[in-house]
């Protein structure tokens, strides 16, 4: 959790829909997207970039690399310091909006994964810059986690459908609104790592839809997500060991793949529409803004832009709490 002086703590509310955020006039895209990879800029101030163009990349490590994409079309106006989602400070590239969009507003037919091999899916995940946000303050490349988990004899993946911190709502709301896509993204990852099965861990109050029959085993378990802690690796492993009688779940360990609904939604969108990570759903609320919601915003959108989209600040806030 990162706290900035001057904005109030978040509140919980019930939401009926998601909202597409305004396209900002400019964005500041962090160079560092995950905790391990060090990227280098591929463009410089004055260059013109398109939406979805790769603007930074890291060296390959066992074939895995980190990549950063421009979330909007425009002109690179400078390099400046910015705060990453996990609270670290790094270089950021400011891009001024200009030109036409490649993805925004385009209707594309989802790709059919049935004819794709696990290797093809893995390469797509690796190329599109998908970050596994299961551990919020230690984001890592999903491809890196898949590669590590796939090395196990009987690899298992666990998908948490709620936020590990009860004060947050992002993953819970994504599960509520996009469970079908989260499920599809999970199947893609399972195929990419040749998983023995998928374990979905949901809040006890969440009504799981009836799941279509799959070739891969799927197990759904529920827990009290309002109890802290309940969504970390240790708690999920204990939950599985206590409640599962499925033989394939016996191999679950800290070396298994643990991920969340946000990451699985990103995976679905990246593979199905060939779309790199250029936007993200965020939950924003507080008693100093007149509205709150789950908003899809461009990567690099500032907190000021978010506040303005919720009606602007109505009073001087006490603190901004990010990821908490």
PLM features per residue range, with description:
Residues 1-42, 57, 221:
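N-terminal, Lys/Arg-enriched amphipathic/low-complexity engagement segments
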Residues 83-147, 151:
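Acidic low-complexity segments
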Residues 176-192:
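Histidine-anchored nucleotide/phosphate-binding helix
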Residues 103, 156-171:
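Gly-rich Lys/Arg/Thr-decorated short loops/hinges at beta-loop-alpha junctions or inter-strand turns
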Residues 1-19, 78, 244-256, 263:
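Extended boundary segments
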Residues 50-65, 80-83, 90-97:
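Short hydrophobic beta/alpha edge segments that flank linear recognition/processing sites
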Residues 33-37, 49-52, 61-78:
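Generic structural motif
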Residues 135, 148-151, 196-303, 309-316, ...:
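Hydrophobic alpha-helical positions that pack around
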